[in-house]
Amino acid sequence: MARYLGPKLKLSRREGTDLFLKSGVRAIDSKCKLETAPGQHGARKPRLSEYGTQLREKQKVRRIYGVLEKQFRNYYKEAARLKGNTGENLLQLLETRLDNVVYRMGFGSTRAEARQLVSHKSVMVNGRVVNIPSFKVSANDVVSIREKSRTQARIKAALEVAAQREKPTWVEVDAAKMEGAFKRLPERSDLSADINEQLIVELYSK
């Protein structure tokens, strides 16, 4: 399945919540009717079945992290093999993606922009260039912007936006040096309460 390249606000309206696909500090609900789905009949909210509710939650999380279906299923399989809560394991695995860590550190204003920085070889992990967005970042890894990429206006703009957001406690960032450390895996309480990962577990357990 190809990566979605259409309007980002439409995806947030489809899921009925801000997926943080647009850059900026403020939530998008002030300019987007999140309670109304896109399309001519968007105002008519269909009653979802149990399966439909589970599917919507999976799609929401998949779109937040910008992961394709096959990748997402593989993350679930890995999460199920790990000890502990499968749903929490899944979210932690998604959080260790390099593109997500770059976003969390504030070097990209969105995960899509962070993914592009990684793909364009603007990001290093422990001093080595890594251009794979799905690269798994481990505790104490140092993520930095390559020296020749540090003059990019979009990175500076992203850091300015990030300075106004609540900073994740599991990363430590030196904005002046454009580098940060991934200190630990985030706890479930660190992540969005708007995600119900148990619905995803129920969906894939069928």
From Swiss-Prot:
Lineage: Bacteria, Pseudomonadati, Pseudomonadota, Gammaproteobacteria, Alteromonadales
Self-association state and partner proteins as the record states: Part of the 30S ribosomal subunit. Contacts protein S5. The interaction surface between S4 and S5 is involved in control of translational fidelity.
InterPro entries with a match to the protein in the record: Ribosomal_uS4 (IPR022801), Ribosomal_uS4_bac-type (IPR005709), Ribosomal_uS4_CS (IPR018079), Ribosomal_uS4_N (IPR001912), S4_RNA-bd (IPR002942), S4_RNA-bd_sf (IPR036986)
GO terms of biological process kind: ribosomal small subunit biogenesis; translation
UniProt gene name: rpsD
Name this polypeptide is given: Small ribosomal subunit protein uS4
Job of this protein: One of the primary rRNA binding proteins, it binds directly to 16S rRNA where it nucleates assembly of the body of the 30S subunit. With S5 and S12 plays an important role in translational accuracy.
Domain of life: Bacteria
Gene3D superfamilies linked: Ribosomal Protein S4 Delta 41, Chain A, domain 1, RNA-binding S4 domain
NCBIfam families cross-referenced by the UniProt entry: PRK05327.1, rpsD_bact
Statement: the UniProt record of this protein carries the keyword rRNA-binding: yes
Family: Belongs to the universal ribosomal protein uS4 family.
Gene Ontology MF term list: rRNA binding; structural constituent of ribosome
PANTHER family given in the database record: 30S 40S RIBOSOMAL PROTEIN, SMALL RIBOSOMAL SUBUNIT PROTEIN US4M
Record keywords: Ribonucleoprotein, Ribosomal protein, RNA-binding, rRNA-binding
GO cellular component: small ribosomal subunit
Domain S4 RNA-binding as annotated: residue spans: 96-156
SUPFAM superfamilies recorded: Alpha-L RNA-binding motif
